[in-house]
């Protein structure tokens, strides 16, 4: 029963430890584990195999360890070094499989967006964040600075945030890191105090190693933002949107290259940050769109060849709400080095 207890404990944290033991190895196990029968002119090896569930086995060998004469578990390639279970990304168990109709979007009842997190800032304002590993999330700098002064520091901001993953599971924030050029780069990362167990409802989305952005390319955006009645929804919603032509988007917003500001010449009254590190996504013919509170959510693109979902963008300008033609997203690929270096340093 001790072996069974190990399986249950590790499975709860997303890791499955499978053990195959026999003969002398059984002497160290519970009597309820039967010894395998012996065979003539042969022998039984004592082996253990490490496996992962919702995780990827990272090891120099094959994860199989043999009990040597010194009663040490060793692998032919890795020696005594144990393998690690690395969180799988971009592989939801129930991906969206059809064009369903975040204004009047569809409810996510299946857990198709396990990377979507809900962030609550000062004065209970709701925004989005995107899980990119089992301990890090991506969001916008504006989200992090909501209801904070311009001279607020990361240490000031972190304690004021509440974060939820999966089925509204609260997680503690250790620190936030904001891009040093946030006036034109609306991006920041959040480190959790502890790693979250990866499962069907909680799974990071993959970071892109290439640029997936091309006009007409379809992506999905999920979020907890305001609905058609301008009320924050208590159910996660999603919508499918096409990447828009950048020139058309810049013309729509008067080609702004500065942070959004009131009283601009834009037809919608505000100008988002638009530059070579951003892209736009337009509304579908059903008039579905993102709205206040959806910022920080991923523009998720499905790579059909790899059957993997990637965060091609992070929603920065979420105030279109079916009024403006386009939402604006930060290209994740443009800041991949900064994101990875920040996680490595911290």
Swiss-Prot record:
**Tissue distribution:** Expressed by the liver and secreted in plasma.
Instruction: Name the species this protein comes from.
Output: Mesocricetus auratus (Golden hamster)
What gene codes for this chain? HP
Occurrences of domain Peptidase S1 (ranges): 102-344
The record's listing under SUPFAM superfamilies reads: Complement control module/SCR domain, Trypsin-like serine proteases
Q: Subunit structure, briefly?
A: Tetramer of two alpha and two beta chains; disulfide-linked. The hemoglobin/haptoglobin complex is composed of a haptoglobin dimer bound to two hemoglobin alpha-beta dimers. Interacts with CD163. Interacts with ERGIC3.
Q: Supply the name of the protein.
A: Haptoglobin
Q: Does the keyword Disulfide bond apply?
A: yes
Q: Where in the cell is it found?
A: Secreted
- Annotated function: As a result of hemolysis, hemoglobin is found to accumulate in the kidney and is secreted in the urine. Haptoglobin captures, and combines with free plasma hemoglobin to allow hepatic recycling of heme iron and to prevent kidney damage. Haptoglobin also acts as an antioxidant, has antibacterial activity and plays a role in modulating many aspects of the acute phase response. Hemoglobin/haptoglobin complexes are rapidly cleared by the macrophage CD163 scavenger receptor expressed on the surface of liver Kupfer cells through an endocytic lysosomal degradation pathway.
Q: Which SMART domains match?
A: Tryp_SPc
């Amino acid at each position: 029963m001790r072996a069974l207890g190990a399986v249950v404990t590790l499975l709860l944290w997303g890791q499955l430890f499978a053990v195959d033991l026999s003969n002398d190895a059984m002497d160290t196990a519970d009597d309820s584990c039967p010894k395998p029968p012996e065979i003539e002119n042969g022998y039984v090896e004592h082996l253990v195999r490490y496996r992962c569930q919702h995780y990827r086995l990272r090891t120099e060998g094959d994860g199989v360890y043999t009990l040597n004469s010194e009663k040490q578990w060793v692998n032919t390639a890795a020696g005594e070094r144990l393998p690690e279970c690395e969180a799988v990304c971009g592989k939801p168990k129930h991906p969206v499989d059809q064009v369903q109709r975040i204004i009047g979007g569809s409810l996510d009842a299946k857990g198709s967006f396990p990377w979507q997190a809900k962030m609550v800032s000062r004065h209970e304002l709701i925004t989005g964040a995107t899980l990119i590993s089992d301990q890090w999330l991506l969001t916008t700098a504006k989200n992090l600075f909501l209801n904070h002064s311009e001279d607020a520091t990361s240490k000031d901001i972190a304690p004021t945030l509440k974060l939820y993953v999966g089925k509204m599971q609260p997680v503690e924030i250790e620190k936030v890191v904001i891009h040093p050029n946030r006036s034109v780069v609306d991006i920041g990362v959040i480190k959790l105090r502890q790693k979250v167990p990866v499962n069907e409802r909680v799974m990071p989305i993959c970071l892109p190693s290439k640029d997936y952005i091309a006009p007409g390319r379809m992506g999905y955006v999920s979020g907890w933002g305001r609905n058609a009645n301008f009320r924050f929804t208590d159910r996660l919603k999603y919508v499918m949107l096409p990447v828009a032509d950048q020139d058309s988007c810049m013309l729509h917003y008067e080609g702004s290259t500065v942070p959004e500001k009131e009283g601009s010449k834009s037809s919608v009254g505000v100008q988002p940050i638009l530059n070579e590190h951003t892209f736009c996504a337009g509304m579908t013919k059903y008039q579905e769109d993102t709205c206040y509170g959806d910022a920080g959510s991923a523009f998720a693109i499905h790579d059909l060849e790899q059957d993997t979902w990637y965060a091609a963008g992070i929603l920065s300008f979420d105030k279109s709400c079916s009024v403006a033609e386009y939402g604006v997203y930060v290209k994740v690929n443009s800041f991949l080095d900064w994101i990875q270096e920040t996680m490595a340093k911290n």
